Structures are given as C-alpha cells and as structure tokens.
UniProtKB/Swiss-Prot annotation:
InterPro entries attached to this UniProt entry: Flu_matrix_M1, Flu_matrix_M1_C, Flu_matrix_M1_N, Flu_matrix_M1_N_sub1, Flu_matrix_M1_N_sub2, INFV_M1
Protein name (database record): Matrix protein 1
Protein role: Plays critical roles in virus replication, from virus entry and uncoating to assembly and budding of the virus particle. M1 binding to ribonucleocapsids (RNPs) in nucleus seems to inhibit viral transcription. Interaction of viral NEP with M1-RNP is thought to promote nuclear export of the complex, which is targeted to the virion assembly site at the apical plasma membrane in polarized epithelial cells. Interactions with NA and HA may bring M1, a non-raft-associated protein, into lipid rafts. Forms a continuous shell on the inner side of the lipid bilayer in virion, where it binds the RNP.
Keywords of the record: Host nucleus, Membrane, RNA-binding, Viral matrix protein, Virion
Family, as annotated: Belongs to the influenza viruses Matrix protein M1 family.
Subunit structure: Homodimer and homomultimer. Interacts with NEP. Binds ribonucleocapsid by both interacting with genomic RNA and NP protein. May interact with HA and NA. Cannot bind NP without genomic RNA.
Miscellaneous comment as given in the Swiss-Prot or TrEMBL entry: Most abundant protein in virion. When expressed alone can form virus-like particles in transfected cells.
Organism: Influenza A virus (strain A/Chicken/Hong Kong/YU562/2001 H5N1 genotype B)
UniProt main location, coarse: virion
Stretches for region Membrane-binding: 1-164
Subcellular location: Virion membrane; Host nucleus
C-alpha cells in the first residue's frame, strides 16, 4: 500500500458516511494525484462544509496544506489553528513539544506513527498545530505518520461508541437505530436505482419505507415494530439488482 493510499484510508475512516464523505474522498484523490493545486480555494471549500467537527476540518486542512504546493508566504487559516490547539490545554501543549522532539529523530512514516500512538488525541492535535503553524518542521512522511496516529485514535473511540450503541439493550435506542438505518438504506436504494424505467420499483419500495418510518415516528410505535425493516429493504434492493443483472454486496 502506498503512503498516500494509507493516509487517505486513515483520514476517511473518521468522516461520517454520506454524500459529503464521497465528496471529500474525491478531493483527497485529486490532491494526491496533483490535479488540485489551488490551496486557497480548497481551504475555503473545507471551511464551509457542514457536519464535520472542527477537529476533522483541522485534520483535513493539515493534509491539504502538506500536500498541495503553495506560495511560501500563504497565510495559515484560523479555523485549522483553532482546531489544532489541543483545546487550549497547557498539558497538551507540553506533551506536544515532547512528542515533537521525538518526531524530529524519526525519518519514516511508520516510525513516527508508532511513537505518536502512545500520546493522547489532544497532544497529537497540538503537535500537528505546532507543525501547521511552522513552529516546528519535520519531513512530510513523519507529519503523515503523526496525522494517521491521530486518525487511528479518533476512529478507535468512534468504533467503541458505535459498538456500545449496537449492543445496547435499551429497546428505545435499538428501535430508533433500526429506523435511522432503514431511512439511510432507503436513500442508498434511490441513489443506486438511478433514473431508468426499471428503477421505478426500487424507488417505490424506498419511498414506502421512508413513509413507514415517518409514520412510526409520528404516532409512536412499539420498540419491536421496527425489527427486520432494514433487512427487508436490503432484500428488495438485492432482488431488484439481480433483475438488472447487477450483483452487489449487502450494505452491511
């Protein structure tokens, strides 16, 4: 796996699924392929994206700044600086300085990543801030190692949170989660269906599912009533794809 492929993988792992994730993936591909060379426009685009947390925007801004060639005097962006200041905690800054001194001795991506993984997310973000603000310089490979260690820590905590929700025994949370998943699956079905005549059936199924979820939320239903809703949708989608001659893995 090439270095840039690895970086792209780690960065995308912390971005929530949806159309915005697909858009960000495309921008990263373009940047890594040298197709997008306007850093100013890229940062302006990133700043105005909805949904993303300030830290995620800071991480993406760090990647773009490392990768896109730019004028030496180009101003650093405030939204990235604020995101990479370790919440203003002096302890994070102290640890970031210690980490930076260790990273100066590293020359490889994997070496830097290993060193960085033993620090907290706040310290890692602060260390990225030091490099972003030109207070310290390391090789691009080492900076990418630091970045990927940060993404790995964030992805780990997101995974723990998702797992807790998936295994919760609270019937109300499970019920709502099934309905949310059914809605997003319906949306995916509509995108897969496209605009062909044969797509009408898949669109109809997706539309009915969304109406059902809306009705369930409006009138309030028994927590077990949503069981199997998403699986039924997926079966319908697979049946439609088979008829269209498309074989696709489940959205699971």
């Amino acid at each position: 796996m090439s270095l840039l492929t690895e970086v792209e993988t780690y960065v995308l792992s912390i971005i929530p699924s949806g159309p915005l994730k697909a858009e960000i993936a495309q921008r990263l591909e373009d940047v890594f392929a040298g197709k997008n060379t306007d850093l100013e426009a890229l940062m302006e685009w990133l700043k105005t994206r909805p949904i993303l947390s300030p830290l995620t925007k800071g991480i993406l801004g760090f990647v773009f700044t490392l990768t896109v060639p730019s004028e030496r005097g180009l101003q650093r962006r405030r939204f990235v600086q604020n995101a990479l200041n370790g919440n203003g905690d002096p302890n994070n800054m102290d640890r970031a300085v210690k980490l930076y001194k260790k990273l100066k001795r590293e020359i490889t991506f994997h070496g830097a990543k290993e060193v960085a993984l033993s620090y907290s997310t706040g310290a890692l973000a602060s260390c990225m801030g030091l490099i972003y603000n030109r207070m310290g310089t390391v090789t691009t490979e080492v900076a990418f190692g630091l970045l990927c260690a940060t993404c790995e820590q964030i992805a780990d905590s997101q995974h723990r949170s998702h797992r807790q929700m998936a295994t919760t025994t609270n019937p109300l949370i499970r019920h709502e989660n099934r309905m949310v998943l059914a809605s997003t699956t319906a949306k995916a079905m509509e995108q897969v269906a496209g605009s062909s005549e044969q797509a009408a059936e898949a669109m109809e199924v997706a539309n009915q599912a969304r109406q059902m979820v809306q009705a369930m939320r409006t009138i309030g239903t028994h927590p077990n009533s949503s069981a199997g809703l998403r699986d039924n949708l997926l079966e319908n989608l697979q049946a439609y794809q088979k008829r269209m001659g498309v074989q696709m893995q489940r959205f699971k």
